[in-house]
């Protein structure tokens, strides 16, 4: 392609150009591609959370769209996106998102509005729409601030659990091994001040 034609292709970005059929084809192709929703970074602006089968978020895309005239178009909120939870069967780790979290919205290939928590068999699409932002899911945990409550699995085969406000366990705790609290072993600690009768021991050592 000559230098003159290259300049013309780059300078004409709309369907009305008569300089090159390539421009027209390129314009139409880009418009078709722009209608295909894949994934986009988002910010959480609303949360419907809980310990039920599913939670939802409302999100705002963090990247503006571009019009045919190369002008920025402000995005609008996307509503009622199911958010990801680490779960297998009836066991789960529940970390509900909060307003202000950043993550990734991904979009299904077809209308999946007919699929819900009770679905066990393939369903017909709810409509003929495809690759639409109406069929989004939210994956959290991208580009957020440092956490203050976390579980850290380390390469030395230890686990560090940090929860400055305390830990609540609902159930029986079984420990295969020792428990050490403030340097005192549960299995091998001793007590002083032991006398027969109704006396009490001193604290553990």
Model-derived features: positions:
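Hydrophobic packing positions characteristic
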Residues: 2-166
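Protruding loop/beta-arch "assembly-hinge" segments enriched in small, turn-prone residues
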Residues: 2-3, 188-205
């Amino acid at each position: 392609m000559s230098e003159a034609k290259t300049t013309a292709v780059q300078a004409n970005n709309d369907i009305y150009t008569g300089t090159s059929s390539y421009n027209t084809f390129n314009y139409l192709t880009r418009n078709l591609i722009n209608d295909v929703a894949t994934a986009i970074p988002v910010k959480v602006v609303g949360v419907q959370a809980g310990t039920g089968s599913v939670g939802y978020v409302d999100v705002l895309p963090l990247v503006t769209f571009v019009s045919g005239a190369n002008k920025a178009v402000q995005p609008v909120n996307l509503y009622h996106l199911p958010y990801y939870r680490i779960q297998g069967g009836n066991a789960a780790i529940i970390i509900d998102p909060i307003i202000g979290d950043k993550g990734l919205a991904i979009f299904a290939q077809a209308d999946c509005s007919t699929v819900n928590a009770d679905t066990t068999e393939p369903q017909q699409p709810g409509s003929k729409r495809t690759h639409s932002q109406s069929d989004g899911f939210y994956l959290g945990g991208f580009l957020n601030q440092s956490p203050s409550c976390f579980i850290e699995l380390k390469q030395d085969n230890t686990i560090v659990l940090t929860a400055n406000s305390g830990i609540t366990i609902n159930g029986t705790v079984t420990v295969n091994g020792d428990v050490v609290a403030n340097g005192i072993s549960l299995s091998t600690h001793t007590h002083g001040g032991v006398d027969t009768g109704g006396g009490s021991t001193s604290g553990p050592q």
